[in-house]
């Protein structure tokens, strides 16, 4: 039985959910890869589809030896980076993995830092407009950048268009603005035989794969999600 305060809180939450405020914003938590992640209005709520990107990264890291350096571009809540770091501790063959998460949003980086502390995972977080303030080269770069076409944002579910941060959704007129930059600039930040892995929209694999090919990436592959839609494009840079 609820006391008066609990009852008031309960009906307040019901009212807010009726206003299409995401459940994750009401609870402040979303599970991803089996881990709890803090979320708020400053970060994209982690989606199950994005777990495909983490699984693809882990499938490569299982075969790596020595020290691995990992960059998560557009890190948001840090769910991709921190899940990979956490799971490599028990699943992968590398001796040690250093993780860096980059995002333009200071508020998002605050959330990512809190999530790292909760999970007991060490990572460096950097405020950067893509690679602008990123130094050094990495064994792997992963990213789930904004990829919704500007003109389509108004058609999204209210929970998404009104409550996920616009800067985490808007990929420009064709949804591909961030891929152009990430692919072009990543070649200056990958070690030889380094991997680039990108989450994509269902109809973006051809364009993204072709740009990676033109930039010098090889062994380009496309991974589908559970719905059978193209979800992750990856490639190896031999530069």
Please annotate each region the language model reported.
Residues 1-60:
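Conserved AdoMet
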Residues 27, 126-128, 200, 224:
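Short loop/edge segments at beta-strand edges and connector loops
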Residues 36, 98, 122-124, 218-221:
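Conserved beta-strand segments of alpha/beta enzyme cores
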Residues 52-155:
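Conserved SAM/SAH cofactor-binding pocket of Class I
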Residues 57, 84, 160, 182-186:
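Class I S-adenosylmethionine-dependent transferase superfamily signal
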Residues 145-147, 236-239:
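C-terminal beta-strand of the catalytic ATP-binding
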Residues 147-177:
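Mobile active-site "lid"/loop adjacent to the S-adenosyl-L-methionine
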Residues 173-237:
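Conserved Class I SAM-dependent methyltransferase catalytic core
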